[in-house]
Regions:
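Long, amphipathic alpha-helical stalk/connector segments used for oligomerization, subunit docking
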Residues: 401-484
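Glycine-rich loop(s) and the adjacent beta-strand/alpha-helix scaffold that form part
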Residues: 199-251, 370, 374-397
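Glycine-rich active-site loop/strand segments that organize a redox cofactor
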Residues: 78-110
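Mobile, glycine/GP-rich and aromatic-enriched active-site lid/loop segments adjacent to catalytic centers
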Residues: 3-6, 115-116, 121-169, 238-378, ...
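Glycine-rich FAD pyrophosphate-binding loop
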Residues: 51-72
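Extreme N-terminal leader/targeting segments of oxidoreductases
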Residues: 1-33
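Core beta-strand elements of the Rossmann-like FAD/NAD(P) dinucleotide-binding domain
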Residues: 28-31, 189-199, 356-357
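N-terminal Rossmann-like FAD-binding beta1-loop-alpha1 element of flavoenzymes
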Residues: 33-58
Length: 554
C-alpha cells in the first residue's frame, strides 16, 4: 500500500454508477422529495420541504422519532442570540481547535438559522424550553426523546409520509446521472420499497462503526456509500475519529458532564493533564495500559439535580451499579463516535447543501461539517445546530429542484439502480452470514485507539491493506436476500468509510483538528486546505483550497 497521490482529478476517478434498471417494488411510491433518515436533520428537511407544498416521503432505518443518537439521549445546541459580540466570541472559540478550516460566513449562517428554528420549535412545535432562575428561556440544549417526538408529530401534520423500519439500500438515478429516488426494504413487512423522487436529501447520519455508543447502532456510513456510488465526493474524512468518554459499564457519552470530572490512574493517583475537552488524548494513552477512573467533582447539590433532570439516562447505569458518581470513583472507557462527533462527510458545493450530483442534497452528519467547525467539534452543540440548519436548507432546495423538473418528467423518467457492494456481487454469492466477518474486520481496524486515535503512516497503511483486501472480498461475494440486505450494505459502508478515513489520514501529514499523527505531531501551515476523497474500488484523495462554497461552485 502506498500513500495516495496528490493531486488527483475528481472526474477521472468517478466510478461507473448506473448498473441496472431499477425493478418495481412491493411498495412503489412517487414524491417530490425523498428524505433518507429520520433524525434532526431529516425531520427538519422533510418539514421545510413540505411547507413549500412539496409531496414528501421520509424513510427511516428505525422508527422516526426514537432511533439515532439524538433521540436516545439529547444534546446541547449552538444557540447564540443575535448579538454581534457574543457571536464573534462563539465562532472564535473553536477556530484553533478546528485547525482554521472553517468558513466564518457559514458559521454565521448556521447561528442565524439555528436561532430562528429553535424559536420556532417552541412557538410552533410546543417544545417545553426550561427557564433560568431570572425567568429567561434557555434554548442551549434539547431533551432528545421529547425533541424528536415533537419533530415526528410536526412532519406528520405537515403531510409527510413516514416509512418506519425501512432502511434505504441504494439511490436511483436517471439516464443523465441525476438522483431520482431510492430503494430499500421494509423490515417489519418483509417487502421491498421504491420511491421515485425529484430530489433526495441524504440525512442518514455518520458512521460510528457499531462501537456501542448509545443511539449509534443505526449510523453505519450508509449515506456516504450511497453518495459515492452516484459519483459524489466526500470531504474531511480524516476528521472522523472522535472518541467520547463513558463509564465503563455505560453506553452514554456526555462530554459536558465529564468536564466536571477529575481523572485518576488505576492506582488512585491523579492523571495529570486529563480532561473531557482538552485532555482526552491523555486518557486514551493511559487506557492503552491501565484502567482509568473518574469522579464528578465541583458540582453543588443544585447542579446535581439539574444534571439528573436534564439527562436522566446518563445516571441510570450508575444507579443500577449502586455508584454515586459525585462521591465515588468509577472506571471509564472511550467509545468511538467516529464522524457523529467528527466533521467528515459528503461534500457540499452550494449554500443550499447540494452535492456535486444533480438532485442529491446532504444534511446533518451525512454531510461534511468542516464549513462550520473545521476539523473538530467535540460534541453535539455545533453538530446539532448544523443538523437544524442544513436540514432546513437542503429540504427547501430539494423541493425547488423537484418543482423545476416538472411533474411529468419526474414521474415518467426511467430510473436505474446504483447499489453495488453488498447488493450485487461481481462473483459467486458467499455465505449468508459473511457480513458478520466483514463488519468485524472493519471494526478491528477502526475502533482501537492505537490505530485510529494515535495515527502513524505504518499503522494506517497496515489497516488499509487489510481493509482493501476485505473490500475486494465483499465486492466479489457479499450479498443477502430480504431483511439481511441491510446488514450487507452496512458492512460494505463501514468498510468503505474506513478506507476513505485512513486514505485521507495518510494524505494529511500533520496534526490538525482531531486528526493526530504520532509521526507528524505539529500543524503544518502548508497544509491549510481541505481534503476531498471518494471512489469505491480505487480510492482517491485531492486537496481543496479553503474558500467559500459559493466560490467553489462558480
Amino acid at each position: 500500500m502506498t500513500d495516495p497521490a496528490l493531486p488527483i482529478s475528481i472526474d477521472s476517478h468517478r466510478d461507473q454508477h448506473a448498473i441496472a434498471t431499477a425493478s418495481p417494488a412491493d411498495l412503489d411510491l412517487t414524491a417530490d422529495v425523498l428524505v433518507i433518515g429520520g433524525g434532526p436533520a431529516g425531520t427538519w428537511a422533510a418539514l421545510k420541504a413540505a411547507e413549500t407544498g412539496a409531496q414528501v416521503v421520509l424513510a427511516d432505518k428505525g422508527y422516526c422519532g426514537t432511533s439515532g443518537p439524538t433521540a436516545a439521549a439529547g444534546t446541547g445546541v449552538w444557540f447564540v442570540p443575535p448579538d454581534a459580540a457574543a457571536r464573534e466570541k462563539a465562532i472564535a472559540h473553536r477556530e484553533a481547535l478546528g485547525g482554521y478550516l472553517h468558513d466564518r460566513r457559514w458559521a454565521h449562517r448556521v447561528l442565524d438559522q439555528t436561532y430562528e428554528n429553535m424559536i420556532e420549535l417552541g412557538e410552533q412545535g410546543g417544545y417545553p424550553w426550561p427557564s433560568a432562575p431570572d425567568g429567561r428561556i434557555v434554548r442551549r440544549g434539547v431533551h432528545g426523546p421529547e425533541y424528536m417526538r415533537r419533530q415526528r408529530i410536526r412532519i406528520q401534520r405537515a403531510g409527510v409520509r413516514i416509512l418506519d423500519h425501512s432502511p434505504a439500500l441504494e439511490l436511483l438515478v436517471d439516464a443523465d446521472g441525476s438522483v431520482a429516488g431510492a430503494a430499500g426494504h421494509q423490515r417489519q413487512q418483509d417487502m421491498t420499497w421504491r420511491v421515485r423522487a425529484g430530489a433526495v436529501v441524504l440525512a442518514a447520519g455518520g458512521c460510528a462503526f457499531l462501537s456501542g455508543a448509545l443511539g449509534c447502532n443505526v449510523v453505519t456510513g450508509d449515506g456516504a456509500l450511497f453518495a459515492a456510488e452516484v459519483g459524489a465526493e466526500l470531504s474531511g474524512m480524516e476528521f472522523s475519529n472522535h472518541y467520547s468518554i463513558a463509564a465503563e459499564f455505560s453506553s452514554v457519552t456526555k462530554g459536558r458532564f465529564f468536564s466536571q470530572a477529575t481523572f485518576f490512574h488505576e492506582d488512585g493517583s491523579l492523571l495529570e493533564g486529563a480532561g473531557s475537552q482538552k485532555g482526552r488524548s491523555v486518557i486514551g494513552r493511559a487506557l492503552l495500559n491501565e484502567k482509568v477512573y473518574a469522579q464528578l467533582h465541583w458540582v453543588d447539590e443544585t447542579t446535581q439535580q439539574f444534571m439528573r433532570h436534564a439527562q436522566p439516562n446518563f445516571f441510570l447505569p450508575f444507579d443500577r451499579h449502586g455508584i454515586d458518581p459525585f462521591t465515588q470513583k468509577f472506571p471509564i472507557t472511550c467509545l468511538l463516535e467516529g464522524s457523529i462527533r467528527g466533521t467528515g462527510g459528503v461534500r457540499i458545493v452550494t449554500d443550499d447543501c447540494a452535492t456535486s450530483v444533480p438532485g442529491l442534497y446532504a444534511a446533518g452528519d451525512s454531510a461534511t461539517r468542516e464549513l462550520v467547525c473545521g476539523g473538530f467539534t467535540g460534541g453535539g452543540s455545533h453538530n446539532a445546530a448544523w443538523a437544524v440548519s442544513s436540514g432546513t436548507w437542503a429540504g427547501r432546495a430539494a423541493a425547488r429542484h423537484a418543482r423545476g423538473l416538472g411533474e411529468r418528467a419526474r414521474r415518467q423518467r426511467p430510473v436505474y439502480a446504483t447499489g453495488q457492494a453488498g447488493l450485487r456481487p461481481t462473483g459467486k454469492p458467499g455465505h449468508p452470514d459473511e457480513h458478520r466477518d466483514i463488519v468485524e474486520i472493519a471494526r478491528g481496524e477502526a475502533l482501537p485507539y492505537e490505530k485510529n486515535w494515535f495515527r502513524t503512516r505504518e499503522r494506517m497503511i497496515t489497516s488499509l491493506d487489510i481493509l482493501n483486501d476485505s473490500w475486494t472480498r465483499l465486492r466479489g461475494s457479499l450479498t443477502a436476500p430480504g431483511p439481511q440486505a441491510r446488514r450487507t450494505r452496512e458492512a460494505a459502508a463501514m468498510t468503505a468509510f474506513a478506507r476513505w478515513m485512513y486514505s485521507a489520514g495518510l494524505a494529511r501529514t500533520e496534526t490538525r483538528g482531531m486528526h493526530k499523527r504520532e509521526d507528524f505531531p505539529q500543524l503544518d501551515q502548508a497544509q491549510h486546505h481541505r481534503l476531498l476523497t471518494g471512489g469505491l474500488d480505487d480510492v482517491w484523495v485531492t486537496p481543496e483550497p479553503v474558500r467559500p462554497v459559493a466560490e467553489m461552485a462558480s
